[in-house]
Amino acid sequence: MEKALLEIEEKARLARAASRPLSYASSAQKDAALKNIARCLLDNGPAILEANLKDQNEAKASGMLPAMLDRLIIDQSRLEGIAKDTFAIAALPDPVGEIFDMNTMPNGLIIGKKRVPLGVIAAIYESRPNVTVDIASLCLKAGNAVILRGGKETIHSNTILAKLIRQAVEQAGLPKEAVQFIENTDRNLVNHLLKLSDQIDLVIPRGGAGLISYVKQNSFIPVVAGGIGVVHVYVDANAKVTDAVNIAYNSKVQRPTVCNAMDTLLVHKDIAPVFLPAVAAEWSKAGVEIRADEAALKILENTFGCKLIPATPDDWGKEFLALIAAVKVVDSLDEALSHIARYGSGHTESIVTQNYTSSQRFLNEVDAAAVMVNASTRFTDGSQFGLGAELGISTQKMHARGPMGLKEITSYKWIVYGSGQIRG
């Protein structure tokens, strides 16, 4: 264990040393590194898929549920998507060096801010191997060194991805030490990593509630956490039924194992008799289990093919990460807002309505990182928000909120232009 701890410290030291030349690397050089990464992924597809297959087989042998297994799978289509996102990050404007908030003082001093990298970012994450590429690419683009620590369930995939990323960075003339990967999945090493505040500037955990809580409780370093998603869709009394069905279906079914998938459907009592059978019929085709309150049960009890069970108090405020939806009929928008305020996690909330006043109340009163009107909750995503990709979706209010892109992993320094002024 002592040797492993020393290796962690050495990786952090190397990342800190590499962060300095990376901080002032040219945009062209950083973009070249990202394009190299994307091409390396495509050129080494068979090896990546083979490594991922090992992860899949080990996950199946350990009894991982199919819904969770989906999170770690890389197939050819997903690999091409990861490469595409990396090319997209390369095409984004470089935030580093941006000058803003410039003002001329009465004494003639010109004072403003210049955007700079944070330095070294440690990313601790679970399940999805695409996160290895997304986070490394975003950190490099923003001039930050990165220390990657993925979960044991994707160790084979993450190992080859990190190796290819380092090769691509070095080919672009940047220090490969700017990307560090921790192969050892012992959690005790994470605890040690979280104490290296002299070498690491920010920790970003991505994963379940247990991981995020552990990092927050044990870190000596500032943490921006990608929080859990207890996500609601509220169907208002005068919603367009076809839109509401499509949004509720997409929010739940399109990819149920991710944090922006809907967990609870709130339905106004006036539209429930028409809307609920319609959405239940669509959900039944996808195998969605409905955990319904008493009012919803009465409406849906004769719906053919519907997986219907009574909701329990524990179902409200639960992140299912599966084809399960809690359904509640509410008397008013006020009741829906109160329910979300009590049970929501501050991630994403959506209203389906044709009433402008209702939409504005929802936007104003719901406290969440992303609040939507007539749109699927699945859009809360870095690529969908035009960020290229994301480091995570923060449910905090400091230092970043919502999908974290390039600007969220930079800081600024004050710059002052004078012409000989002295303070009297």
UniProtKB/Swiss-Prot annotation:
Q: What gene, per UniProt, encodes this protein?
A: proA
- Top EC class per UniProt? oxidoreductase
Q: Where in the cell is it found?
A: Cytoplasm
Task: Specify the pathway.
Answer: Amino-acid biosynthesis; L-proline biosynthesis; L-glutamate 5-semialdehyde from L-glutamate: step 2/2
GO cellular component terms, A-Z: cytoplasm
Q: Which Pfam families match?
A: Aldedh
Q: What does this protein do?
A: Catalyzes the NADPH-dependent reduction of L-glutamate 5-phosphate into L-glutamate 5-semialdehyde and phosphate. The product spontaneously undergoes cyclization to form 1-pyrroline-5-carboxylate.
Q: Which family does it belong to?
A: Belongs to the gamma-glutamyl phosphate reductase family.
- Gene Ontology MF terms: glutamate-5-semialdehyde dehydrogenase activity; NADP binding
The opening ranks of the lineage are: Bacteria, Bacillati, Chloroflexota, Dehalococcoidia, Dehalococcoidales
What is the protein name given in its UniProt record?
A: Gamma-glutamyl phosphate reductase
Q: Which organism is it from?
A: Dehalococcoides mccartyi (strain ATCC BAA-2100 / JCM 16839 / KCTC 5957 / BAV1)
| GO biological process per UniProt | L-proline biosynthetic process
Q: Keyword Oxidoreductase on this protein?
A: yes
Q: Which InterPro entries match?
A: Ald_DH/histidinol_DH, Ald_DH_C, Ald_DH_N, Aldehyde_DH_dom, G-glutamylP_reductase_CS, Glu-5-SA_DH, GPR_dom
